[in-house]
Amino acid sequence: MSERCGRGSVRRRSVLGVSLCALLAGCGSGRTSGEEVVSGECVPASEAMSSPSVSPSRKSDGSTVDIVYFPEDYIAAEGLAVSPDGALVAANQLRARFVLGLDSTFGTVIWDASTGKVVRRLDNRRDGVLAWHPGGEWLAVGDAFNAAIQVTDREGNLLWELRGHERIDELGSPIADLAFSKDGELLASASRDGTVRLWGMRKDQCRPVRVLTISEPRRLSFSPDSDRLAVAAEDGCSIWNVHSGEREKLLHEVPHPVTGVAYGPDGVLVAITSDPGASYLIRGEQVEAGPEPPTSSPSRVAVSKDGRIAISASSDPQVMLWDPATQVSSLAPEPPETVGRMEWSPDGQNLYAASQKHGVLCWLADGLRRFDLP
């Protein structure tokens, strides 16, 4: 991996004892066909709502929600994205330190990938999932308490607010994952409301395209040709045709719960499961065993430009790297805690990960480095 990088972190807990980790598992399917979107809209910036509430205190039924914030929480576990040219890394700073009066803002922060220094704060008060458009100019941003998705330019200027997913009362982001197609024409959003929505994204146009009904979708990955979407959900792993909305496959050979999916550049789909802890390689109609994860609870997977696979766990800080050319696996230098979302740099040289307490982490040829905290 290349030679330079930088440092950051966050976590939220509930006095009600709700586990966020329990909300982030799965890979699956529901119906055998999609439905044309009859609701949902791309609202232009001039009509969009103001910033989401900083710390909502009531559910829709009027009951109260108590949230405990911790000053050592910095980065959203799923809020990480690398720019298509590899020059920048974005992550979402959690609201914890803002609520506690320790920071003046929270939301999307952008770092220089080579130095690990903060170059921009979007001050958008969003701390959920994050995706970077392959054209490099747009970011799609979720929020911990808001079901609407914001699409902004890289300076933080709001372009559209995507509405259609339902609000979820329980703690944990209602938007579980966001992914742009490789050609940049679609944005997929997975929600805990039991749907995956597809949004058309072309130049200066945004429109709702389709909604797929899927039981508890958690992870998304587009195929290299942008024609298919793999969905990790509570009851299994499925592959959907994005043009017809038809479910093409429900992978019965992959036991559920499936906790992660990622397409490689050659079209091979990698799926990981937590019970038992295993990985699978899906090549067309063939499903074969993949590299053995480092622990029994693999939770995230990322595939590089040259097909190398990184797998992390929810219960152990180890990150395993597997090279398909040599069929050899190794452990990356151990991070200080378990990591969230992982992404490779476009050239496949660096691996980035979100750490709630320690910020953005970067594995390079000479070891593990931390970006500056936001």
What are the residue ranges of the model-derived segments?
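WD40-repeat beta-propeller superdomains and closely related acidic/aromatic-rich repeat-like regions
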Residues: 3, 17, 21-374
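N-terminal secretory signal peptides that target proteins for export/translocation
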Residues: 1-7
